[in-house]
Amino acid sequence: MQKWKKLSFCAVLLTSLAFAGCGTPQASTTGETTGAKQEQSSAPQTMQVNLNSGEPSTIDPGLAEDIPSMSVARAAFDGLLRLNEKGELKEAVAEKYEVSADGLTYTFHLRESKWTNGDPVTAHDFEYAWKRVLDPKTASGYAYQMYYLKNGQAFNANKAKAEDVGVKATDDKTLVVTLENPAPFFPELVASVTYFPVNKKAVEGNKEWASKPETYMTNGPFTLKNWEHKSKIEFEKSDSYWDKDAVKLSTLTLNMIEDANTELSMFEKGDLDWAGSPLGDLPLDALDALKESGKMQAQATAGTYWYIFNTTQKPFDNKKIRQAFATAVNRQEISDNVVPYKSTPATGILPPTMALTPEGYIKDGNVETAKKLLAEGMQEAGIKELPPITIAYNTSEVNSRIATVIQDQWRKAFGIEVKLVNKENKVHREDMKQGNFTIGRGSWIGDFNDPINFLEVFKGGLNTSKWENKEFIDLLAQSAKEGDVAKRKEILKKAEQIVMDEMPALPIYYFTYAWVKQDSVKDVVVDALGFIDFKYASNQK
């Protein structure tokens, strides 16, 4: 998942809370669960949160690529499966499902549920939505998440027809899915935003269907009530939702306040019920006091903050020059001085929850080696001086501080001046996609707990570095067909080694989220992959 992770926002870092081992990360649920423990108040419950990235890039689930966009879609839509209030994967629109003995066929049986216009949600809606994501005309950056479907990649590459794709509604209530290869994590994928249904009538009736309340047809806990662009997005509880009794909030408002100090000030005044990650930000200078007050909560997240090199532009079309700039970065200095409480320096692409090489790949802040690599790279490139270099990042306090420190580290290591450019999030993302950058701030937080999800970022539509390596691509394809867990791990380890040797991205740190909430807020689910879900949230003031 892009978390501009990965990408549109910055997770605040606290004491390193790396997950133990490589098991499935657990979600966090705020406060005690309500349910039978509390009598439901008759007064309407509302919640005010902040979306500090500003305007979501889209609220179309088939096009969503970042946490803000996906969080909005998660409030408005429901998939076949969903995390419950305890963070457990449970049936949602699917009442039940079966998996064949060979792990290749999933059969989902749908319950009675409705769209906001009253039409029934059918298996045909899911078939249409999934094939729409894969359709090359849609140009979905997340189409690769559907490559696990039989002929999914072939259809996306115009080498197969839509009817060849392994998803078929055999009737209104039955969806049969056939995979290319067994994928034990497929149920996790099915719960992700990309796999949400969309209503064909709404999508094809208006190209701008996902921009106005009157055309935004949804099937989830909330329905879009109002969208004041660059100000706020307002949701109200959906009366047509199949599980509406579990939804306690009457309204949910996502404000768009980009300044972290303003966000915290509004929280302290009671104008916000939640401040900080995953959707907002907390001012770094306030973290000590918030921690000491006991109000702040923290949760490790399966994500990596990195810089992307544009490998089509000089000088970063040269591998050794990329290695030089990566090696010169002192990540420990950033952890100790830029972001408090010793965040974990990232010496590899994969976060600790998925690490294949726990010791990492990069010797942190090795200036002498960096100088040697730079000299060798410049000689190979036939240049005597470096062209102008710019670090581009989306606006946030943390992003700015990190860029300033790395700018200084490269100045001291190489005697060069690096320009810093901050941009509104949507502009930054589009410039990255179009290749209008030299070095760009980015990140990734897993969509599911498997190394392949991180490694696949460096191929296909999300690969903003434009780096290509045939051996790497072949290894990823080989891993998809390998049924032996140990052998598959070794294949992915080789693939990661290639990425770290070629260095299309410069890893900087591993994410930890931090937030504060009003005492009345309960049952907000923050999963270990960086998503927030308000379906079960309550706010009895």
Which residue ranges define each predicted feature?
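Structural transition elements
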Residues: 344-377, 396-401
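Surface-exposed binding/hinge segments that line
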Residues: 127, 143-200
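Gly/Pro-rich hinge or "lid" segments in bacterial periplasmic/extracellular proteins
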Residues: 179-247, 251
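Alpha-helical secondary-structure segments
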Residues: 123-129, 172-178, 182, 220-221, ...
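Aromatic- and charge-enriched surface segment that lines or borders ligand/interaction sites
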Residues: 95-142, 176, 315
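Extracytoplasmic/peripheral linker and loop segments enriched in polar/acidic and small residues
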Residues: 417-428, 456-520, 540-541
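Ligand-site clamp/hinge motif
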Residues: 207-210, 240-285
